[in-house]
């Protein structure tokens, strides 16, 4: 069953990345690889949130968690495309842009990961908490 979770997650992540990258590239045809940058940072934010939330707050089986993180987010984000795009910038003698991309990707990824962790640990509002408790008791 684990492989099914990984396969479905991987399929969703890869297809999602393809469509989102195509959409962003139509909007931003510039030299800076914005699509990959946005996708990778979004993946870092989601990874931080999902791992923290599912390990600390939400009961979730390890197979589903692995399908969401390794499968879906692993296929959604892409280190290889980041590397190729950086190399193309360097080969095209766009060294300042390549360095900006490197720094913005690495620092941005760490910041987004930490932001996801922070968001997952925010306390639930009393209204949201009472809504969850009411649903668990069956008193809707």
Swiss-Prot record:
GO terms for molecular function: fluoride channel activity; metal ion binding. GO terms for cellular component: plasma membrane. It comes from the Bacteria. It catalyses: fluoride(in) = fluoride(out). The chain crosses the membrane at residues 4-24, 32-52, 70-90, 99-119. GO terms for biological process: cellular detoxification of fluoride. Na(+) is not transported, but it plays an essential structural role and its presence is essential for fluoride channel function. It is found in: Cell membrane. Keywords: Cell membrane, Ion channel, Ion transport, Membrane, Metal-binding, Sodium, Transmembrane, Transmembrane helix, Transport. Its main location: membrane. Pfam families: CRCB. Na(+) binds at residues 74, 77. InterPro entries: FluC. It is a multi-pass membrane protein. Belongs to the fluoride channel Fluc/FEX (TC 1.A.43) family. Fluoride-specific ion channel. Important for reducing fluoride concentration in the cell, thus reducing its toxicity. PANTHER family: FLUORIDE EXPORT PROTEIN 1-RELATED. This is Fluoride-specific ion channel FluC 1. It comes from Moorella thermoacetica (strain ATCC 39073 / JCM 9320). The gene is fluC1.
